[in-house]
Amino acid sequence: MNMVQAINLALRQEMERDESVLILGEDVGKDGGVFRVTDGLLDAFGPERVIDTPLAESGIVGSAVGMAIAGLRPVCEMQFDGFSYLMIPQLEGNASRYRARTRSQRTVPMVVRIPYGGGVRALEHHSEARETFYAFPGVKVVVPSGPRNARSLMASAIRDPDPVVFLEPKRSYRAFKEEVPESADDLPIGKAQVVRQGTDLTVVSWGAMMRPVIQAVEDVASARSVTIELIDLLTLAPMDAEAVASSVRKTGRLVVVQESPRSFGVASEVIAQVNDRSFLYLEAPVKRVTGYDVVTPYFGRENLYIPGVERIRNGIEETLDF
């Protein structure tokens, strides 16, 4: 099952389980979404629970906030990452604040699905990775890296009592398949996953970058006879900082890989958390392998912008050699 199918399965199962779950967004009904993630759900659940909306991102999320306050569990879809910025006033100004405003008497259980990132030969405002834009206090930010954890994290996001931004790496949608069990794994929001155990170096990444990172880690580990610990964050906010810090206390070295621009990104927060918790254990400067501080380029230059296996491998080797 690929990631599109896995997310579709999670949506279908959660809608069957809980009648308060509904879907709204641009073309999510009749067309099944721009990437067909909601394909077949209109036929299964009808137009009252799978709602096609106008092209108005702020209106979609604002409506979802009202639905959630009224007792529903809406899942909204933004067609592309670059269009999602229009809904930020609703996400930050209303959804993120409602628990605090009511002193936790009321919450806003809603999910905002956002296809994000490059690698699909699209325009720059269809290909951006700006994860930190959504990490307001009161909002949880989740990024799956494969079909199996996408299905489980979507179930956790829908059941969560607070607003969740569910970032879906577009180039992972149909890039590979995994066996997805009938029942979702117990994969709580806020918990990172150690993909590979090691003692010589820690590598941290998330989302679509996990595929080239795994390849680079395997290449270096094989060539150098070292063991490298690999952590998939899965949740960016709240970050499982202790999982990273405890790994660094064991390995003494850290490389963080992200697709987004170098400055003001999730990698910077990972490094700050490690400095707070494990600085005295570091045996080398922490390395960032990232995109560049430029507007996301057109698809003809994406291969230069998005970190590939070679750049990641070089970053790992430089850190090991320090």
Q: Where are the predicted features?
A:
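Thiamine diphosphate
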Residues: 1-163, 167, 170-322
